[in-house]
Amino acid sequence: MKVTLTAILTCAAVLVLHTTAAEELEESQLMEVGMPDTELAAVDEERLFECSVSCEIEKEGNKGCKKKKCKGGWKCKFNMCVKV
């Protein structure tokens, strides 16, 4: 009986700790409203630069825009990465 009770209490404690850790992780990953999107802006600028460079290189060779450079739901259009 003691073993079963100990096992149940241990399982409950682990479940509570796991749930608390998951909630803390989720809260830490949320963005606060009003905070600047500097990380996203940096990614967008990087994609724009990569796309422009790849398009300019291919333009000189009279080829179309290289769509492989823009990844993750983005495509290259008019020498810019645009969200699809």
UniProtKB/Swiss-Prot annotation:
Residues 1-22 form the signal peptide. It comes from Cyriopagopus hainanus. PROSITE patterns: HWTX_2 (PS60022). Expressed by the venom gland. Belongs to the neurotoxin 12 (Hwtx-2) family. 02 (Hwtx-2) subfamily. The lineage of its organism: Eukaryota, Metazoa, Ecdysozoa, Arthropoda, Chelicerata. InterPro entries: Hwtx-2-like (IPR012625). It is found in: Secreted. Keywords: Disulfide bond, Neurotoxin, Postsynaptic neurotoxin, Secreted, Signal, Toxin. GO terms for cellular component: extracellular region; host cell postsynaptic membrane. Pfam families: Toxin_20. This is U4-theraphotoxin-Hhn1b.
